[in-house]
Amino acid sequence: MEEEKSFSAWSWSVEQCLKEYKTRLDKGLTSEDVQIRRQKYGFNELAKEKGKPLWHLVLEQFDDTLVKILLGAAFISFVLAFLGEEHGSGSGFEAFVEPFVIVLILILNAVVGVWQESNAEKALEALKEMQCESAKVLRDGNVLPNLPARELVPGDIVELNVGDKVPADMRVSGLKTSTLRVEQSSLTGEAMPVLKGANLVVMDDCELQGKENMVFAGTTVVNGSCVCIVTSIGMDTEIGKIQRQIHEASLEESETPLKKKLDEFGSRLTTAICIVCVLVWMINYKNFVSWDVVDGYKPVNIKFSFEKCTYYFKIAVALAVAAIPEGLPAVITTCLALGTRKMAQKNAIVRKLPSVETLGCTTVICSDKTGTLTTNQMSATEFFTLGGKTTTTRVFSVSGTTYDPKDGGIVDWGCNNMDANLQAVAEICSICNDAGVFYEGKLFRATGLPTEAALKVLVEKMGIPEKKNSENIEEVTNFSDNGSSVKLACCDWWNKRSKKVATLEFDRVRKSMSVIVSEPNGQNRLLVKGAAESILERSSFAQLADGSLVALDESSREVILKKHSEMTSKGLRCLGLAYKDELGEFSDYSSEEHPSHKKLLDPSSYSNIETNLIFVGVVGLRDPPREEVGRAIEDCRDAGIRVMVITGDNKSTAEAICCEIRLFSENEDLSQSSFTGKEFMSLPASRRSEILSKSGGKVFSRAEPRHKQEIVRMLKEMGEIVAMTGDGVNDAPALKLADIGIAMGITGTEVAKEASDMVLADDNFSTIVSAVAEGRSIYNNMKAFIRYMISSNVGEVISIFLTAALGIPECMIPVQLLWVNLVTDGPPATALGFNPADIDIMKKPPRKSDDCLIDSWVLIRYLVIGSYVGVATVGIFVLWYTQASFLGISLISDGHTLVSFTQLQNWSECSSWGTNFTATPYTVAGGLRTIAFENNPCDYFTLGKVKPMTLSLTVLVAIEMFNSLNALSEDNSLLTMPPWRNPWLLVAMTVSFALHCVILYVPFLANVFGIVPLSFREWFVVILVSFPVILIDEALKFIGRCRRTRIKKKIKTM
């Protein structure tokens, strides 16, 4: 197999290829040959990569630090609930609420993760759909018209016809028609169908585009028919190599910047949680283990209380629950989903949620040219003819960049009655042409060759020769309904005037095509269009503006060639136009019955017919840049994002477009910025890295898939965050490898779309820039709500730590903390995702990959705010037990018993207090319920703590609502960034308070969460205790602003 794999079939003659593959054109392979080769090469099908089993995918979802901590907390909570060891937290169903909710969250998270993973490799499935199902094959001297394509082997002789999908990589052995065109844009990125022939290509190391005698699996024959020799099948085909590259790229997929930050944060949080949990448990060791000491150091009479040990262990578990922001994954997912909706409104369809955030830190955009930077609609931008004499030219500029006949026109067109020369231009462009235009999906599209469609649109902009006749065709220029052909009235007028009687098809030798038409005067005329140099070389005369003919001499040829050179330097594709009236034996040709018809069946005779031509003019066409791309390139430059254009087009065209879109300045030296793919790859690795690391734009032309992948891989190794655009099958590996793969929605193949992270509905580069801006805004908002949620959790941790350190009863139980983290915090955190974007968001450089979510100053703020949260929640608990009033507001209106702070600290020793301690019943819910302690006064510190625990929980909720207002802006005061700037946040706060009231005032839920209703007086106390968090953070923001101003001044003076 190695021998065939290394055999460059394109660089060898057909006879040598037949000898190499041991086959014959007249008989094909024998059945015995097929069997032997089948055993050696296998079937012609793409390999099925082994996917991960379901159980493996499920386990992977739990391979996360935070998830492992939650699993541990859930397991311990379940065991303690099952053993009935929960101290003062109820029994039965209520005891299992906490582990049940945690496990439910983890299961939902795993389901989403498995679903995303199982859909990740759809690109490979889409690739398989491109494969051909059957082929017309010659074996044992017999034609098999519908042999299953999977049964092909190297050496098979296959016939291809118009519309056939190529079943394998094959060497063209001969054409059965004058020309053969294959649509291979999905594989190579070439915009137009490619001419194929049987002549060898004298290059062993040849680009895919240069293999003009090869047809590739998955491409389609659009014109002509041929006979081919199968050279590669299955995974050895070009499409097979792409599948292998997609698979390898998927293995190289790295985590998104945010995922890395969250993992890093998770690891640090794990360490902190373990330390604090152990510390909390150890602080209270005297409450569950005691001993006497003899001889100064020997412990005796050791007493151990398993009940109290598990109780304080439960507190440690509660601390873990408090420290972990359980609602964070859900809020992040919600924020990203909201971001996708915003992007969809801007024509950016996000397929993978994490890519929304990754867009925000993009540092390099690698963009294709065709269809992304350009319109992917060929248009004539200028044409020239000779003037009144052979030494002058007339140049006409044409506006409009689409196939819409009414898009633009000919600039300063004063030819209401066209002269003979311009009439010849219009006649050739409209009749020597097989293309058309149709209207679909609010877009004008071409049928046939794009260049020919552009010529027909040019004719519509020119109008018809006589002004008086234009009134008769004006009404029919309106296009029909969606999906139908567009009526090209001017072209129809020319086609009715001059009837086409024969076509001389294009071939690559003469580089032209022509038609014989019957003119109104009864004479035949040959209309020719083709490569401008080739047309000029075969022209003997030229037509002047008045229609007169003059012989072409050297000076007039120089004038034409100079103008042609100017046009090509602008990146225009130039087509020469000519005609011929003296047709000899074809002067009266009218049908296939004509005696000279045999000559028209022989393409080798066409070049003799197309001689002594009359030169008419040259039309310059191009795929024009989108109008908005130049502005988008400048936005990228302002935002610190580098743009690199990677295209399959030739170097001069690519450079011209890049200069026009202002990627390069007009007189910029491009020697270090513009390379062909082959030139770049031939450089040493160190030199390539140096080129890629330099600032400014880059353009890589004639780039192959492997070149794109290598450029992306090198950029990623340099620490860049790379966005890559593509539309073809050949782009799929690079799309998969890039941090952000962006496929084209209009021109993109299904393979490219499935391999991408995002699809552009309008194929427009400026949409990428808008998406980057949205990604940056989303990241800033995510940072706001992450900081908000973490600061809330720090407060919860400090609250539990203070409870344990002071030795008082726990003021909140795990299920309450879980409710706060998941439900109460959720709406405000999500609403912070709606914060308006900063005005200068695209004036700042991309954030660095090592940019911290939490820097030292933010950490100090967390600790200060968290400390207040802890003091407030524990303080209200202590106040209820020990104080009769707070700021003049009575706390004992419910009739509860006051105790000293010392008693509260030593509540676990209550049983030893004897009859000295009694607890009177107190009322809740406006006197509708009484909590009594008749059997055991010590229950006052367990069952009786339901009211102070409710106060602590409500203070925590209220503080976190006020703290969400602080998160509106990282540095700006609420005076400059008022809450109504984000009305969704006010709605979310209302929802969270409403949810809290539901669990307070619905008896069943109140029992589940171990709380009771509060009175109006108690709510007033809650607000008084909670509101200062806003004043504290305002002071911290002021200090932060002063600190930043001081740093800026210091930098300026350095």
Curated annotation (Swiss-Prot):
Protein residues bound to Ca(2+) 1: 793, 796, 824-825, 960
Positions in the Cytoplasmic compartment: 1-53, 119-262, 331-782, 834-853, 970-982, 1038-1054
InterPro entries in the record: ATPase_P-typ_cation-transptr_C (IPR006068), ATPase_P-typ_cation-transptr_N (IPR004014), ATPase_P-typ_cyto_dom_N (IPR023299), ATPase_P-typ_P_site (IPR018303), ATPase_P-typ_TM_dom_sf (IPR023298), ATPase_P-typ_transduc_dom_A_sf (IPR008250), HAD-like_sf (IPR036412), HAD_sf (IPR023214)
Record Pfam families: Cation_ATPase (PF13246), Cation_ATPase_C (PF00689), Cation_ATPase_N (PF00690), E1-E2_ATPase (PF00122), Hydrolase (PF00702)
GO cellular component: endoplasmic reticulum; membrane
Stated role: This magnesium-dependent enzyme catalyzes the hydrolysis of ATP coupled with the translocation of calcium from the cytosol to an endomembrane compartment.
Gene: ECA2
Protein name: Calcium-transporting ATPase 2, endoplasmic reticulum-type
Residues the record lists as binding Mg(2+): 727, 731
